[in-house]
């Protein structure tokens, strides 16, 4: 049985997948398996993965219909047999000592059921930006800092970390299938509910490729019901941590700012062109939203532009009809900037 399982969700990355897999095979720590999960790629990514599997017995490939990164990672977790698990995105790559450094940190803690994480580098087309973190050891009593400090930083991604697979299995921790925004943050928060410690090391062995997408925010929005469910999943976890660690509301500001985009997507889901909800359904959704989530709206609806400020005022202090008229007007004139994002 390998010590470490490396899970790589793969989707339309034929341009980068060679560099990703090659970097894994060049690891100085060699007791690992690689699980490449082809999430219905329409390019040659899947066949490239198969070629690597034929050449190296440590590689296993799984092909599935396109279901999203969360489902692909869950497939990897179901098939993994290693004692520990790490995730690598298929357009990123790792330096030769990535696994070795993480595992050495684990041995320092006599293994245990913790979370090991290192730092990383943002890789832009024209420059590389190392992300500096200080060496740190947190025990369970200190995990409130996940919410008060780290949630708004760069430490909540699922990659660049080493997880205990037994803990994941025993606590039935998994990625939520419909979540494609901050899905890794949910997983990390769930895992840390049961972890004994978090060990942070300032080694730059993970290289994160920063890509510039031409997608608009609306093109990445699901149905209203789906977006609301995702937002509630985050609110549930924030409330859990806040209650358990008795975190004051004033210390939750970083958390609210971080998940603002989720609430923005809930609102935009009502109005984005692909959903085409009727007037009566839009008003019903707005009524349900304001009736049951008024305090959360005040915290999460953080205006970035004048149009947003007007929208927030109408939603909270005027009628739902007024808000609906305003939002429909903005979409009718093809207004391009709402909630700090490009929407059309």
What are these regions (language model features)?
Residues 85:
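Short aromatic/hydrophobic "clamp" motif used to bind/position activated sugar donors
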Residues 271-344:
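Membrane-interface aromatic/basic loop that binds lipid-linked glycans or pyrophosphate carriers
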Residues 2-4, 25-36, 44, 56-60:
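Short loop->beta transition adjacent to catalytic acidic/histidine clusters or analogous donor-positioning motifs
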Residues 1-25:
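N-proximal low-complexity "stem/linker" segments adjacent to membrane-targeting elements
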